[in-house]
Design a protein with these regions (language model features):
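Short, surface-exposed patches at the edges or C-terminal ends of soluble domains, predominantly
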Residues: 1-242
Length: 242
């Protein structure tokens, strides 16, 4: 039987909806080809029934309890959580995302990253990078991502050690606040097998950008996660999120 990864696309914090045909119909339509089932979820508790949880431009800050719920999901239950922001702290998006991200040792900077040299179609805000360190292989373990385009992205500040680079800008990428162009990063929970991924932009997988370079493959690779079996008090393994 072909493995299926169940993805909860949250709308619990007024995120961009994946069912918005104009913006996200491609990722929703193509997901099954990559073994992904994407559901829009409006119940906080229900989110944690899935393998991967996506917060795509949340507009409501996370409460302390919600942060602890997400920490438990990643560190104990082995879930994958993806949090995506935007450049320049538009609508205080960096501040909002950081109410959750700093629990995993990262923060979004309130800056903008541009690249006058490595970009799409001469637009410096459509930052192109070949420095894709993670999620560059498909389920067959073959490389299917060589470059991505990340439009309107901010950078990420690491505040704890052991953060993994997912995508960094090229040497020509610049921050208007002179920050290092770390654009997408991972926190890995080695015991549970969980992940927390933070991205400086939420539009690299919209209907326009997902057609650029290898963005489609990168998006699908990043969404994929298989929740590891967890041990119960009786010593029997169970699989969450299936």
């Amino acid at each position: 039987m072909k493995k299926i990864c169940r993805v909860a696309w949250s709308i619990t914090h007024q995120e961009f909806t994946v069912t918005d045909y104009y913006y996200f119909s491609i990722i929703e339509k193509r997901a099954p080809e990559f073994g992904l089932q994407i559901d829009e979820v409006d119940s906080w508790d229900k989110l944690f029934e899935y393998d991967t949880i996506v917060f795509n431009y949340p507009e409501i800050p996370f409460t302390e309890k919600e942060v602890q719920d997400v920490v438990k999901a990643v560190e104990e239950l082995g879930k994958k959580v993806i949090l995506l922001g935007y450049y320049k702290n538009e609508d205080h998006i960096a501040d909002t995302c950081n109410t959750l991200a700093r629990a995993f040792g990262m923060e979004l900077n309130p800056d903008e990253i541009t690249d006058e040299v490595s970009n799409h179609d001469g637009d410096k805000y459509f930052v192109k990078s070949t420095k894709v360190r993670r999620y560059n292989k498909g389920l067959d373990n073959k490389v299917n991502v060589n470059a991505v385009v990340l439009p309107c992205t901010c950078s990420i500040k690491t505040i704890m050690p052991d953060i993994k680079i997912v995508v960094a800008g090229e040497e020509t990428a610049k921050s208007n606040m002179e920050n290092y162009p770390l654009l997408i990063a991972d926190h890995i929970a080695p015991v549970s097998g969980g992940y927390f991924t933070l991205a400086g932009t939420c539009v690299f997988w919209d209907n326009y950008a997902i057609r650029l370079e290898d963005n489609l493959n990168f998006a699908m690779n990043m969404l994929w996660h298989e929740t590891p079996p967890q041990d119960t008090p009786t010593g029997k393994a169970v699989r969450f999120g299936l």
